[in-house]
Structure formats: structure tokens, C-alpha cells
Design a protein with these regions (language model features):
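Conserved catalytic-core motifs of eukaryotic protein kinase domains, centered on the activation segment
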Residues: 126-127, 155
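Conserved N-terminal segment of class I S-adenosyl-L-methionine
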Residues: 1-104, 108, 131, 158-189, ...
């Protein structure tokens, strides 16, 4: 049976970002994705070797999941039920896509070597629960990226976007500065690296017992 559509929830703004006509937005997005690629390349420098099983939570149309699959063997990617996303997923052969909620991940504890969430946590009604779930199903690494506030909203205002909402992108329920996001992630994992590909914050963290 097909999963029911998610009503009243903003799935995200991935498509607008990846297909933007504005050359500045395209450039910033390319740099952000390159930063994620660099973070992925650092994983596996310990005795465990490269990750073998990877999960992306909130995968959108699958761009990041596809890049993950180019590096790692098994990639599972999930997002909320949405007909548009299902159409996008058909373009990618490698990752295994499914519908699920970040608040209740349908996997056993310690299932994945690395869990990735890129522009997801800001959308969650309960980000603490989402973070705990990612830590539960992960066994080694977390790679997490969110808009860096208040910079992200300021950029929207400068571009004349979402002015009536003071620059807040639709669906962004949570807002972190670089420092507050590091503090947030540190609840469940040891933060090893923080980068700031403008206007985002990206964190690589190691889960308890994730390195020998």
C-alpha cells in the first residue's frame, strides 16, 4: 500500500535551491554540496575503515543521497510521503528510498555507520527527538547541516524573499547560530569538525563508541 501524502507539512525547499536561476544561489549551493562531499571524504580514517551502511534523513529529491552512494555501498534515504519526491527518486538507481518520519526512524539501534541530515533539523517540530533518533540508529558518525542564523534570514531579506516573515523560509521551525548548533549536537555526540559554508553550518560528530 502506498504511504499517505503528508498534509499540512512543508517538505522542504530543496528543489528551489538546486534548480535556482539566480547564479548566486546556485554558487552557494554548489559550495555547500562540495563542503558535504569533503566531510564525507574524511570519514573512515580510523581502524573501522570507510562506512559501509549510510542513512540520509530528509533526503528531499535525492541529490545528496546520490552523492553518498558514489562513495559508500549501501545508502538508505528517507523523507515524508510526497508524490513529487517519488517522481524525483526514480532518477537515481543507487540509493534505496523510502517514506518515514525523522521522529521515528524504522531501524534497529546502531544500524548505520553514518547518518546524514542536510537541511532537515530546522524543519522538525521536535528536533531533540529527531537528533536522538539519528544517534540511536547510527553507530559511528553524524554529518548534520542547518542554515546558520541569523545570517540565512538576512540573506533572504537582502534578496527580497519572505519579507513578510522577516526572511524566515517556509517550514523553518528551528533556528541555530553556529555556536548553538554545536551545543545542540554535543548532546549526543562528540563534535570533531565545524565548517561554515555560507550561509550554513555543517557539523561532523562521532557517536559514543564510534571510534576504537
Amino acid at each position: 500500500m502506498a504511504a499517505p501524502e503528508t498534509v499540512g507539512v512543508v517538505i522542504g525547499n530543496h528543489t528551489q535551491k538546486y534548480t535556482a536561476r539566480n547564479p548566486a544561489i546556485r554558487l552557494l549551493t554548489e559550495r555547500w554540496v562540495a563542503n558535504l562531499d569533503r566531510a564525507f571524504g574524511q570519514l573512515g580514517g580510523d581502524a573501522h575503515g570507510p562506512p559501509e551502511q549510510a542513512l540520509e534523513v530528509g533526503c528531499g529529491e535525492g541529490v545528496v543521497a546520490d552523492r553518498m552512494h558514489r562513495r559508500w555501498g549501501e545508502v538508505v534515504a528517507l523523507d515524508l510521503p510526497d508524490a513529487g519526491l517519488r517522481a524525483d527518486w526514480r532518477r537515481y538507481r543507487g540509493p534505496r528510498f523510502l517514506h518515514a518520519s525523522a521522529h521515528e526512524l524504522p531501524f534497529a539501534d546502531n544500524r548505520f555507520d553514518v547518518v546524514v541530515a542536510a537541511e532537515v533539523l530546522e524543519h522538525l517540530p521536535d528536533p531533540d527527538r529527531g537528533l536522538r533518533e539519528m544517534a540511536r540508529v547510527g553507530r559511528r558518525h553524524l554529518v548534520l547541516s542547518v542554515p546558520r542564523e541569523p545570517v540565512f534570514r538576512s540573506c533572504n531579506l537582502v534578496a527580497g524573499r519572505y519579507v513578510r516573515d522577516l526572511g524566515n523560509t517556509p517550514g523553518h521551525l528551528n533556528h541555530w547560530s553556529r555556536r548553538s548548533f554545536v551545543r545542540f549536537v554535543s548532546q549526543v555526540a562528540e563534535v570533531r569538525e565545524v565548517t561554515s559554508p555560507f550561509p550554513w553550518t555543517t557539523v561532523w560528530a562521532v557517536l559514543p563508541g564510534g571510534e576504537p
